[in-house]
UniProtKB/Swiss-Prot annotation:
Location of the protein in the cell: Cytoplasm
Name of the featured protein: UvrABC system protein C
Span of the signal peptide: none
Organism: Nitrobacter hamburgensis (strain DSM 10229 / NCIMB 13809 / X14)
Described purpose of this protein according to its UniProt entry: The UvrABC repair system catalyzes the recognition and processing of DNA lesions. UvrC both incises the 5' and 3' sides of the lesion. The N-terminal half is responsible for the 3' incision and the C-terminal half is responsible for the 5' incision.
Spans annotated as Disordered: 1-60
Subunit details: Interacts with UvrB in an incision complex.
Keyword flag rRNA processing: no
Biased composition regions of type Acidic residues, renumbered to the chain: 41-58
Principal place of residence: cytoplasm
Keywords: Cytoplasm, DNA damage, DNA excision, DNA repair, Excision nuclease, SOS response
Molecular functions per Gene Ontology: DNA binding; excinuclease ABC activity
Location of the GIY-YIG domain: 82-160
């Protein structure tokens, strides 16, 4: 989808490059989450792993609980309206078991009270039901939208669960500056400009923006960075920006580049490529071979974008394509996004659903939740025919403000798109099942090596980082049967002010005490649920804690656990080998001889990966904290840099970020900065944390 966001505020004036004149774009305040493509990280979410789908019990359910559940339902039926609404079935602890909607709530609830004919899943739900709450709605479409919202919010055990509420990224070409910027954007589309999307992932946006910069030379820097330039930055040197900040291109020329980029993203790619080809031929005919080569490179960048897109349909302008595949009790929904006739990526989802759900049931529930907080396209193409497709289409049409079609194509190009999505769903689920099986074998092998009673379902790995005690931070990563659970990573800014600089033991003590005191507090507040797994079967309590270090670190952590009264959590320390060689690590466990595994042992490689991931995460957290500290302090903390040199550096580089990126040689080119001072500045920004 391409959208415009305009602001009636007074236009902002240009930064006076040649030819800018008074012709400006609308001004306005920048809001939303705008992201420099250079800083894009891989999206992480619950859908990166398979949900836990327990086997359904085959034992008959006792008549007593069923009778109690039916009695609760019959009581609700007597007071239920015959109008549309949403109902919530809850157990005695008032946990929501199921959220449903109905055109006639009383009739729907009556169907649960029948003494026979219920499938096992429904019977188990009835047996657990203690109370029912009802919310009436004006229409059935309103009930459908409310049901989807409540399922995402409450995550009931007996519903299909999407397990992902992240918004999708868009490409934004800003409209509040005379020299528009191209960037990734998430969130409310309140900043003036043109929005193109949604894209399947931040990575897809980053790759597209990089290629667009090569093709159209549109800037990606922030407005503050732009305004502070006195010379072109590196992106100009590598031909990924036209350099409007310092007048390397005039206003009409840059406006033409932005228009071409907008036309390309709006689906007019053929016209843009034909125009660039004409310009290339003209430059070649004029013997301006350097200019012709620039047009050639821009055409190649556009071709690279289109080759990454794969399928670009001829008859589908704007559509989302959904296909579902079930195997081994799991479901995979593959989604392809087509906008302006272009394929803007695809993504696999693994919704949580009990094994008795049919593909049609899973897909229908998935769609309602998927569009709960996302704008629907004009057409939604499906691999399976879902119930109430017309109701869903009506609800999404009301939500979008335009007609939305929900179709299961039978022939032609649309059918081919669905078949392609179905192939991708089948392959994605196959890969995920294989990865999960490998992870399961590694966890079982780890349990065997360490003598654990069972394969760990939750492993927590801890590390800390600092430079001579400053900007100290601890970090925890989490792994389980589905791999690394990045949405459960945590960082701990060290709060203690009386720590001896570099006291790793004290830092680790603070991190572990904060982590496990919180768990103990939660257990005391709700002892009945303390040992239950969280939703999606990730326990709160770890089976195994791993720390980076030797016997001394292990004994220190053991003392912390003894003081907290923790005995159910297994501990292990991983000490690096001689010369810090990977493959020669020693494993330390309480009251057991040290363990050395063969360098090629898969379990050792798995442990190394966990330790290295913890180190990567804590180093990244430390650097973010340190950069924030440095930027707040400016250059005042750099030894030997007074006000005059500070002004010279900022005048030469424009921003503190550029000073941080500069090499020793670049720093030495600044007037008044000696080779010794350049080395001090470089070392200040690049000293490796401990």
């Amino acid at each position: 989808m391409t959208t415009d966001s305009s602001d009636p505020a007074k236009p902002a004036g240009p930064g006076q490059p040649p030819g800018s004149g008074a012709d400006t774009r609308p001004g306005g305040l920048a809001t939303g989450q705008d992201v420099d493509p250079a800083t894009i990280e891989t999206d992480e979410d619950d859908e990166a792993r398979l949900p836990d789908v327990p086997d359904e019990p085959t034992d008959a359910i006792a008549e007593g609980p069923l009778a109690v559940g039916r009695a609760a339902i019959e009581h609700a039926v007597r007071h239920a309206p015959t109008s549309p609404g949403v109902y919530r079935m809850m157990n005695a602890a008032r946990d929501v078991l199921y959220v449903g909607k109905a055109k006639n709530v009383r009739k729907r609830l009556s169907s649960y009270a029948r003494p026979t004919g219920q499938v096992m899943r429904i019977a188990r739900m009835i047996a657990a039901t203690s109370t029912i709450e009802i919310v009436s709605t004006e229409t059935e479409t309103e009930a459908l939208l409310l049901e989807a919202n409540l399922i995402k919010q409450l995550r009931p055990r007996f519903n299909v669960q999407l397990r992902d509420d992240k918004s999708f990224p868009y490409i934004l070409i800003t409209g509040d500056h005379w020299a528009p910027q191209i960037l990734k954007h998430r969130g409310a589309q309140s900043r003036p400009g043109r929005y193109f999307g949604p894209f399947a992932s931040a990575g897809a946006v980053g790759r597209t923006i990089t290629a667009l910069q090569r093709a159209f030379l549109v800037r990606s820097c922030t407005d503050s960075f732009f305004e502070g330039r006195t010379r072109p930055c590196l992106l100009y040197q590598i031909k990924r920006c036209a350099g409007p900040c310092t007048g390397e291109i005039d206003f009409p020329g840059y406006t033409a580049l932005v228009r071409e980029a907008t036309d390309f993203l709006s689906g007019r790619s053929r016209a843009v490529k034909e125009e660039l080809a004409r310009e290339m031929e003209k430059a070649s005919g004029d013997l301006a071979f350097e200019r012709a080569a620039l047009y050639r490179d821009r055409l190649a960048a556009l071709s690279a974008i289109q080759s990454q897109q794969g399928i670009n349909p001829r008859t589908v302008e704007e559509a989302d394509v959904f296909a579902i595949h079930q195997e081994g009790g799991y479901s995979c929904v593959e989604v392809f996004f087509f906008r302006t006739g272009q394929n803007w990526g695809n993504r696999a989802y693994f919704p949580r659903a009990e094994k008795s759900f049919t593909p049609e049931e899973v897909l229908g529930a998935f769609l309602a939740q998927f569009y709960d907080d996302k704008p629907p396209p004009k057409v939604i193409l499906l691999s399976h025919r879902i119930e109430e497709s017309e109701l869903l289409a009506d609800a999404l049409s009301i939500k979008a403000g335009h007609k939305v079609g929900v179709l299961m194509p039978q022939r032609g190009e649309k059918k081919e798109l669905v078949a392609h999505a179905l192939t991708n769903a089948r392959e994605a689920l196959g890969r995920k099942l294989a990865d999960t099986a490998t992870q399961s074998r590694l966890l079982q092998g780890l349990a065997t090596v360490l003598g654990l009673p069972h394969a760990p379902r939750r492993i927590e790995v801890y590390d800390n980082s600092h430079i001579q005690g400053t900007n100290a931070v601890g970090a925890m990563i989490v792994a389980g049967p589905e791999g690394l659970l990045k949405n459960q990573y945590r960082k701990f800014n060290i709060r203690s002010e009386n720590l001896t600089p570099g006291d790793d033991y004290a830092m680790m003590r603070e991190v572990l005490e904060r982590r496990f005191k919180r768990l103990l507090t939660q257990k005391a507040a709700d002892p009945d649920k303390a040992d239950e797994p969280e939703k999606d079967a990730v326990p709160q309590w770890p089976d195994l804690v791993i720390i980076d270090g030797g016997l001394g670190q292990l004994n220190a952590v053991r003392g912390i656990f003894d003081a907290l009264g923790l005995s159910q959590v297994s501990l292990m320390a991983v000490a690096k080998g001689p010369d810090r060689d990977a493959g020669r690590e020693t494993l330390f466990l309480p009251d057991r001889p040290a363990i050395k595994l063969e360098p090629r042992d898969p379990v050792l490689y798995f442990i190394q990966r966990l330790r290295d991931e913890a180190h990567r995460f804590v180093i990244g957290s430390h650097r973010k904290l340190r950069r924030k500290d440095i930027r707040e302090a400016g250059l005042q903390e750099v030894p030997g840099i007074g006000p005059a040199r500070k002004r010279a550096l900022l005048h030469h580089f424009g921003t503190l970020k550029e000073i941080e990126r500069a090499s020793v040689a670049d720093l030495g080119k600044v007037p008044g900065i000696s080779a010794e001072s350049a080395r001090k500045i470089f070392d200040f920004f690049h000293t490796r944390p401990g």
